Amino acid sequence: MATQILLCFFLFFSVTLSSSGHPKNFSVELIHRDSPLSPIYNPQITVTDRLNAAFLRSVSRSRRFNHQLSQTDLQSGLIGADGEFFMSITIGTPPIKVFAIADTGSDLTWVQCKPCQQCYKENGPIFDKKKSSTYKSEPCDSRNCQALSSTERGCDESNNICKYRYSYGDQSFSKGDVATETVSIDSASGSPVSFPGTVFGCGYNNGGTFDETGSGIIGLGGGHLSLISQLGSSISKKFSYCLSHKSATTNGTSVINLGTNSIPSSLSKDSGVVSTPLVDKEPLTYYYLTLEAISVGKKKIPYTGSSYNPNDDGILSETSGNIIIDSGTTLTLLEAGFFDKFSSAVEESVTGAKRVSDPQGLLSHCFKSGSAEIGLPEITVHFTGADVRLSPINAFVKLSEDMVCLSMVPTTEVAIYGNFAQMDFLVGYDLETRTVSFQHMDCSANL
């Protein structure tokens, strides 16, 4: 069976909400778009077609990152409004359940709101701000309004209401009011956790390619207006996730752990936990690590890619933070010059198969066997202070019974450490100490 997709989202926290009465540990359930539990699941689509669609989304997402890193006009960089996971939250008083796309590449959460000027078809109820006793518009001079970029915010001066506007590269868009509201998250234990005064976008003018099963976007990036950034002290600025390669085609769901006890423990010598620093860079939405080298078997290849941070002359500078870790991107994208050396080492190390072309033309290095079993090399990723040894499912994807492809591709833009490379790891984020930890784990046992 072909290797399955499981993408997840990051959560990033800072203090903006009161943590009084909130648990220090809880879990949130996510439903993958390709899971049989997903509202957009189509049993007629083959596993191979699902994989190819995910690969194409990886390319689109990397372009979006590149635009946001290299342009000041963020609207031109928002490419694609689809996502890999749906997340359920409730909003307002009385509460209305909304089912929205979880997106690590966005900060402000927005949902469709009545009264609509233009709203796309939605299967569930649309949030009506007039029926909620806890809805409150944000004034134009508020800190939360000013946290939006100049291209994303506006002002209704006659009513002193802050406005947001998001325009995506696939012609999707959302416009509306910035407001605060009570948001509740259904934890995996079954008990909802409520956060009053959460900043969000109340979208009354929305259209494009949004799926009718979703109410909007849940912003899970690292910026100040991210839903998760607003929860900060409520979960001690710690979270972890475990991505299982099985859950995209089973009735299992993905669970992200939030709070003090969510981080991999390194107290035991046999824990296998390794940690690497998070690098602080703009824009805050993304999570930057420093990649030093990748080993293929015993051959260690120094990473030659620059961090995508052009200086005033448009020249890339050799600094730390040269790769973004992102669970919303399926593939791993590596600097083209380095990739040539790395992929050559992989090709030399594969046994029992010959190199062939990917039938879809999406992956650069595929290998096909006759009747023999394909021998794949061990690959180790060397981040600063952390050597992460990958399993075959982390570096290769099985497209058929006799063909596998390297799930890493070259790029001339921003490097991304993608979802496949993170499967069956407990990946922990300690945003107080600014570290990311990795620990091998059977994630299917933790769903």
Swiss-Prot record:
Glycosylated residues, chain numbering: N25, N251
Presence of the UniProt keyword Secreted in the record: yes
Loss of function: phenotype: No visible phenotype.
Parts of the chain that traverse the membrane: none
Any matching Pfam family: TAXi_N
GO biological process: pollen tube guidance; proteolysis
Domain (Peptidase A1): residue spans on this chain: 85-439
Keywords, in A-Z order: Aspartyl protease, Glycoprotein, Hydrolase, Protease, Repeat, Secreted, Signal
Intracellular or extracellular location(s): Secreted
UniProt xrefs under Gene3D superfamilies: Acid Proteases
PROSITE patterns xrefs: ASP_PROTEASE, PEPTIDASE_A1
EC number in record: 3.4.-.-
Single annotated GO MF: aspartic-type endopeptidase activity
Domain of life the protein comes from: Eukaryota
PANTHER family in UniProt: ASPARTIC PROTEINASE CDR1-LIKE, OS07G0603500 PROTEIN-RELATED
Family recorded in the similarity comment: Belongs to the peptidase A1 family.
Name of the featured protein: Probable aspartic protease At2g35615
Native source organism of the sequence: Arabidopsis thaliana (Mouse-ear cress)
Classification of source organism: Eukaryota, Viridiplantae, Streptophyta, Embryophyta, Tracheophyta
